[in-house]
Amino acid sequence: MRVLLAGGGSAGHTSPLLATADALRRLDPATEITCLGTREGLEARLVPEAGLPLEIVPRLPLPRRPGPDLLRTPSRLRAARAAALEVVDRVRPDVVVGFGGYVSVPAYLAARRRSLPIVVHEGNAIPGIANKLGARMTSHVATSFPDTVLPHAVVTGLPIRRLISTMDRGALRTEAMASFGLRDDLPTLLVTGGSQGAARINAAVSGAAGDLAAAGVQVLHVVGPKHGLDVASGEVPYVVLNYVDRMDLAYAAADAVLCRSGSNTVTEVAGVGLPAIYVPLPIGNGEQSLNARPVIDAGGGLLVADAALTPEWVAATVPGLLTDPDRLAGMGAAARGIIPLDADEILARMILDAGAAR
């Protein structure tokens, strides 16, 4: 079977695409997979690194408000759809799968033009424009969260990397602590703003470094590739990294996480059983707050608004949490209990079934 996977721009679209590609190849090694993306997104690097072919279409911004970009959308859409049609006619997929974002719209339109089965996967709690459109063209619709409103939606969860979904944090703990230069006798707060970092999170946690050290809380702080941070690391380590290739080791080293609440982050953090302090990104249509809501409601995390995250808040809240092992254990178990870790294979089977029924 030939499958065309469309998605990219951010890690939120690219990561589940790659996880699904892996699951398709596990379930049916004969599956031929082609990815559709842009030159500007993360997929331009990550898809080839995963050993998958990447076809390029022009970037298609979908403006949320009136303005010059909105006026240019029709011509950009025609160009992107024409490019997607050329790929579809050349690759001849049996099924087209979209993960949302700029790339999915021309993929959906090209698939409909050629009467191909479409599978839509929505990663966020609130669907974006692309997947609202795609869901009107198919009955094969998968969502990550139970309250996402799309026609024909089936909750599959969010596909994540097997490296994460199958990891044993306890078995990796010793290796992880040594890898990052952390002490094994102190609780560890993992701080990350996602693939691009987060200035607000960086400033708030680093500003409370002294209070965290005084409480005996060590920090593993992934600041992002575009951010720098100068924090003195003393007897209680405060480790600053721009990027971490082995997030499984970062999760194994952590006792709790302070992070954004993109769908991929929520799924990975909760899925491995880590309690978290979620700081939703205050843009878009509020989907990050809703992404974290099932975990919060289950007792697996805390939610703090971006504007409320200050060094003072961190100093007043984090030490008490990190030095309470029973509370951490309860929160971790609650988080782990609500996240499906086999979403990659569930979605892959949906894709294979849709393609076979053509």
Would you name each region that the model predicts?
Residues 327-341:
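A short, well-ordered alpha-helix in the C-terminal region of glycosyltransferases
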Residues 112-174:
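Active-site-proximal region of nucleotide-activated glycan assembly enzymes
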Residues 13-25:
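Short amphipathic alpha-helix
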Residues 340-358:
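C-terminal alpha-helical cap of glycosyltransferases
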Residues 41, 46-50, 172-178, 182-259, ...:
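Donor-nucleotide binding loops and adjacent catalytic segments primarily
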Residues 114, 252-255, 270-279, 298:
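Conserved donor-binding/catalytic loop of nucleotide-activated donor transferases
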Residues 83-96, 104-119, 132-137:
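Glycosyltransferases and closely related glycan-assembly transferases
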Residues 3-11, 30-85, 156, 307:
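Conserved nucleotide-sugar phosphate-binding/catalytic loop shared by glycosyltransferases and other
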